[in-house]
């Protein structure tokens, strides 16, 4: 551990103590040596006793900077781990930081291009259009076609700073894991590892560019979603160039109302887009907060979404998709037994789980939701409550399912903000039922066979040889089995004979011993003893030598 990391660790602990966050630790995590270290190394006391624990954590993360802000934002989606109060407070964290010098941005861009900016772009504006904790955006005009573009560039040395903070987080999480012991629900090391994978993915703008290109191609003919064009030839790990868009932020309800936007259609399209990305394309935008979503200015009666920032994308396996769809359908059919079965069948919880106890726990949580009208039931909260319940049965929450839950909560909140009467179930149910119908039956089977056709057509010429080899192997196997059977029968015969002789010898030896104490002829006991000994020797020598068949 370097001096810099020790200094940073001290600063982090000092900040957390300033906000009194040691007060929320359970007693088992504050043994005497912890208290001694706290009082000798840190003489700071809680300066914010008037604030709740969740608010203090939010303020501490805000003060610690971008990496901790992003961690807080991610934790706000883990309501299966945190209380609603804490999660709500962390959701208020804003990834807003002062911009860095435009001259430094120019140097960073030119380092990636390996040429002056003016070689490829005109009108480069050193004043950023927007800035965030990881990157900054500048406007320019493409020299080759005169089109307006934006250049997204990483902050100087951001990778080093993030790696240092991640290392510190990881080490701290392991210590907390150790203090909490086996069976703790928080699993801090697991949470930090998920966060590490997510944030490191955001540090590669080339990967983000490829994600954007793929998402754009998936919706190239869509009238519901537009992804700006990415100029791949100008994309590098620390630089990304894409088409500039001119939309209205989805959070600007006043501007959307002023242009006469069809809010009902917009809200329904948002839900359809989510389920299309998840179930049709298996590739969904997992960072759909309001800052990344804009609405088109033209044709407000037929509005479409404009999606930005494809740094975090989610995918699900075919198995996860199927179980997820069945979960939602089973929930709205109030089939809690099926939900419990699905969690076990999918491997999300152990097959050793008590099915009846799990079903009862799900029923206790889900049944009260039906006291509301269907159009007020939240998909995201259904998924959240199911995960939270399953947590008590040692669920292994997959990172992609956490991303899905977060995205679903964003989409629902957005949809109901745009159109409070949105009936999410009526919008999504036909889509889910159609998708499930496509997964079973003759059409689904034909489709699966069709996708495998090139593979099997390539293997078809090998079939005659494979059949011949298998028949040949079968004959050898039958012959081998017959030999094994013969050996086994011979072994059994030898064993029976040996056992018979040994038992008979034992009887004769016992009889000979008893006859010594009886009024028998002097010869009788000796005949029995000698016969018994001879039979024992013959029986012992006739035992099967081994059991290898």
UniProtKB/Swiss-Prot annotation:
Pathway: Cofactor biosynthesis; ubiquinone biosynthesis [regulation]. It is an enzyme of class 2 (transferase). The chain crosses the membrane at residues 498-518, 520-540. GO terms for molecular function: ATP binding; protein kinase activity. GO terms for biological process: regulation of ubiquinone biosynthetic process; ubiquinone biosynthetic process. GO terms for cellular component: plasma membrane. The gene is ubiB. The keyword Transferase applies. This is Probable protein kinase UbiB.
């Amino acid at each position: 551990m370097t001096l810099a990391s020790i200094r940073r660790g001290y600063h982090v602990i000092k900040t957390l103590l300033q906000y009194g966050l040691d007060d929320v630790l359970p007693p088992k995590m504050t043994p005497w040596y912890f208290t001694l270290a706290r009082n000798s190394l840190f003489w700071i006391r809680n300066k914010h006793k008037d604030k709740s624990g969740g608010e203090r954590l939010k303020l501490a993360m805000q003060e610690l900077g971008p990496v901790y802000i992003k961690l807080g934002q991610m934790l706000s989606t883990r309501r299966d781990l945190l209380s609603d109060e804490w999660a709500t407070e962390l959701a208020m964290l804003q990834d807003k930081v002062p911009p860095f010098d435009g001259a430094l941005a120019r140097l960073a861009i030119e380092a990636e291009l390996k040429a002056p900016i003016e070689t490829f772009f005109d009108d480069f504006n050193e004043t950023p259009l927007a800035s965030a904790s990881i990157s900054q955006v500048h406007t320019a005009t493409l020299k080759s076609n005169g089109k307006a573009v934006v250049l997204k560039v990483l902050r100087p040395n951001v990778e080093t700073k993030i790696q240092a903070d991640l290392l510190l987080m990881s080490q701290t999480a392991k210590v907390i894991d150790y203090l909490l012991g086996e069976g703790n629900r928080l699993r801090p090391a697991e949470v930090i590892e998920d966060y590490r994978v997510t944030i490191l993915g955001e540090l590669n703008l080339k990967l983000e560019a490829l994600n954007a290109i793929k998402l754009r191609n998936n919706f190239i003919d869509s009238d519901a979603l537009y992804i700006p064009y990415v100029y791949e030839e100008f994309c590098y790990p620390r630089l990304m160039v894409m088409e500039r868009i001119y939309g209205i932020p989805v959070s600007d309800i006043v501007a959307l109302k002023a242009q006469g936007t069809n809010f009902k259609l917009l809200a329904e399209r948002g839900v359809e887009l989510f389920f299309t990305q998840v179930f049709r394309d298996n590739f969904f935008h997992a960072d759909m907060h309001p800052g990344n979503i804009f609405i088109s200015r033209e044709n407000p009666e037929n509005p479409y979404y404009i999606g930005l920032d494809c740094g975090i994308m989610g995918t699900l396996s075919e198995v996860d998709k199927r179980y997820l769809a069945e979960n939602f359908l089973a929930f709205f059919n109030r089939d809690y037994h099926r939900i419990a079965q699905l969690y076990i069948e999918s491997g999300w919880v152990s097959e050793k789980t008590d099915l009846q106890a799990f079903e009862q726990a799900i029923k206790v949580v889900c049944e009260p939701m039906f006291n509301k009208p269907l159009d007020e039931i939240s998909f995201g909260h259904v998924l959240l409550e199911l995960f939270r319940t399953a947590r008590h049965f040692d669920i292994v929450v997959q990172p992609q399912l956490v991303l899905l839950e977060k995205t679903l909560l964003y989409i629902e909140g957005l949809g109901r903000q745009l159109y409070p009467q949105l009936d999410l179930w009526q919008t999504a149910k036909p889509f889910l039922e159609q998708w499930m119908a496509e997964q079973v039956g003759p059409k689904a089977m034909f489709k699966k066979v069709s996708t495998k056709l090139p593979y099997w057509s390539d293997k078809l010429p090998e079939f005659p040889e494979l059949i011949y080899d298998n028949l040949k192997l079968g004959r050898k196997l039958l012959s081998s089995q017959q030999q094994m059977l013969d050996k086994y029968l011979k072994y059994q015969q030898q064993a029976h004979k040996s056992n018979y002789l040994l038992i008979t010898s034992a009887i004769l030896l016992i009889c000979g011993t008893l006859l010594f104490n009886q009024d028998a002829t002097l010869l009788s006991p000796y005949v029995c003893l000698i016969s018994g000994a001879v039979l024992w020797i013959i029986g012992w020598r006739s035992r099967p030598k081994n059991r290898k068949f």
